Amino acid sequence: MLVLTRRPHQQIMLGDDITINIVDVNGENVRIAIDAPRHVKI
């Protein structure tokens, strides 16, 4: 298992076309936003 640490407003890139953005961290809750092409199933 790969564990990554990121702060709010940082992002993780998966390949060239998928971005995972850390929107907010509130205690143990993390809000993420995923930006990917339509043909990629999330």
Segments predicted by a language model, with ranges:
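Compact, glycine-rich, soluble single-domain proteins
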Residues: 1-42
